[in-house]
Amino acid sequence: SFFTDADQQRLVAAIQAAERNTSGEIRVHVEQTCPAPDPLERAKEVFAMLHMHETVQQNGVLFYLTLDDRKFALLGDRGIDAVVPPGFWNATRDAMRDHLHAGRLVDGLVEGIQRAGEHLKAYFPYRRDDRNELSDEVSFG
């Protein structure tokens, strides 16, 4: 796989740190190439495939990335879309894009995950009774 064990551990640690701030659930899915013309459409398929829509607050966030063509998409569930302002993900996406275009894929994902945790904290603060509803492991397609 393109990501070393250390890379994957770094991503899992970033997800766990972000999820200490928010009840939002963050996942990363990586594929070699994007089978759809639009990475956002593929992200929607992956979101469903990973059962990310099954969180109690519908506040899952998927970071979708392809290695060959460096396409990526950020997708938040309905519960997030219902409460955040338009363009909520734009700053996160733009910050990631610079890293990804420079080939710093793990750095880009880590920065995106950190920002997602910070931004979601205002809308979905961490609750003491919160449980980890989705795996923190990176999934590969």
Predicted regions and their residues:
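A structural boundary signal for the start of the first folded domain, especially the loop/turn
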Residues: 1-60, 65-141
